[in-house]
């Protein structure tokens, strides 16, 4: 029979914190989306890890498991009075994906290096994934709810955080949202982030609404791919954000097709040629000279015409002289 303590790799006297750490590490290790080459085994391990955590993280379930084993949970206990067992009608294990979502419900695993240690900055002010320390620790944001534990601690600055994830066949997706607002109406800021895995690539969409302006940034594997402000592509803001991130600006492809048309000056000629003043002068001289000279073929045509007219006049004179003789 499976031993849940062995599944999580903890001692029987392990604390609740030790059990959380063990589940966090193993759930991320055996998540099926992280093991596409060995998905069948990963699904089995992922399910066992979820079962072990679901039992050992709950004091009542853990007590029954310690006394009666897994059968005590499923079949309502191995003996004794029904009053000793709150699961007298049997305990049903939840879907391992639901356990995973609940555990990471207060944080978006994609907002830092996924499959690392996403809760390290929640407990005891430990160092976070980007090297910053959280002085508030677990007292400021609860590990699962994500909302302020003490609403009156910051009366002039309210913050909210929500998050959920979806573990479907199309890949691992998640969503998180934060909002900040002071006592006045002009300081509101809302930030929402959604992330999904598409063909092995992490696509992150960040939506920022501040003082009536909406800014949407789309990243692919950490590289900014597009940026819009109020629904319009903004090349200048895109380039500025790339500089801020130290990212080489990619060729900008605006979503608005009107921006693809190049600017054409009103008085610009249809064809433009580049030449210097000497060439202009030579061309002008040549043009004037050619206009003064009679082309060869035109001169021949004129000469022939004169001869024909002269011949016609001579024939007319002969006819007149002949008539006069009669």
UniProtKB/Swiss-Prot annotation:
InterPro entries: DnaJ_domain, DnaJ_domain_CS, DNJB2/6-like, J_dom_sf. GO terms for biological process: chaperone-mediated protein folding. It is found in: Cytoplasm, Perinuclear region; Nucleus. Keywords: Chaperone, Cytoplasm, Nucleus, Phosphoprotein. Residues 3-69 form the J domain. GO terms for molecular function: Hsp70 protein binding; protein folding chaperone; protein-folding chaperone binding; unfolded protein binding. Residues 249-326 are annotated as: Disordered. Transmembrane segments: none annotated. The modification Phosphoserine is found at residue 277. GO terms for cellular component: cytoplasm; nucleus; perinuclear region of cytoplasm. Homooligomer. Has a stimulatory effect on the ATPase activity of HSP70 in a dose-dependent and time-dependent manner and hence acts as a co-chaperone of HSP70. Plays an indispensable role in the organization of KRT8/KRT18 filaments. Acts as an endogenous molecular chaperone for neuronal proteins including huntingtin. Suppresses aggregation and toxicity of polyglutamine-containing, aggregation-prone proteins. Also reduces cellular toxicity and caspase-3 activity. This is DnaJ homolog subfamily B member 6.
């Amino acid at each position: 029979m499976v031993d849940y303590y062995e599944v999580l790799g903890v001692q029987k006297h392990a604390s609740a914190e030790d059990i959380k750490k063990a589940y966090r590490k193993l759930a991320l290790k055996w998540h099926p989306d992280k093991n596409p080459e060995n998905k069948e085994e990963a699904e089995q391990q992922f399910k066992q890890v979820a079962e072990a955590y679901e039992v050992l993280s709950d004091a009542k379930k853990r007590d029954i498991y310690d006394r009666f084993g897994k059968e005590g949970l499923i079949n309502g206990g191995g003996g004794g009075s029904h009053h000793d067992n709150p699961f007298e009608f049997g305990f049903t294990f939840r879907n391992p994906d639901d356990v995973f979502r609940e555990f990471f419900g207060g944080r978006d695993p994609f907002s830092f290096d996924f499959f690392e240690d996403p809760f390290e900055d929640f407990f005891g002010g430990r160092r976070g994934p980007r090297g910053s320390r959280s002085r508030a620790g677990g007292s400021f944001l609860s590990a699962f709810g994500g909302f302020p534990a003490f609403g009156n601690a910051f009366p002039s600055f309210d913050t909210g955080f929500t998050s959920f994830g979806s573990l479907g066949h199309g890949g691992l997706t998640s969503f998180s949202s934060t909002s900040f607002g002071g006592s006045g109406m002009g300081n509101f800021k809302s930030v929402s982030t959604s992330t999904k895995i598409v063909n092995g690539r992490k696509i992150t969409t960040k939506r920022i609404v501040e003082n009536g302006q909406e800014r949407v940034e789309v990243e692919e594997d950490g590289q900014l791919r597009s940026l819009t402000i109020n629904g319009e592509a903004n090349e200048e803001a895109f380039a500025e954000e790339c500089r801020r991130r130290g990212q080489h600006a990619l060729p900008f492809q605006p979503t608005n097709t009107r921006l693809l048309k190049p600017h054409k000056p009103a008085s610009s000629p249809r064809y433009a040629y580049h030449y210097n003043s000497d060439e202009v002068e030579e061309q002008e001289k040549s043009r004037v000279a050619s206009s003064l000279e009679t082309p060869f073929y035109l001169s021949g045509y004129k000469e022939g015409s004169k001869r024909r007219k002269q011949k016609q006049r001579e024939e007319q004179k002969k006819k007149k002289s002949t008539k006069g003789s009669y």
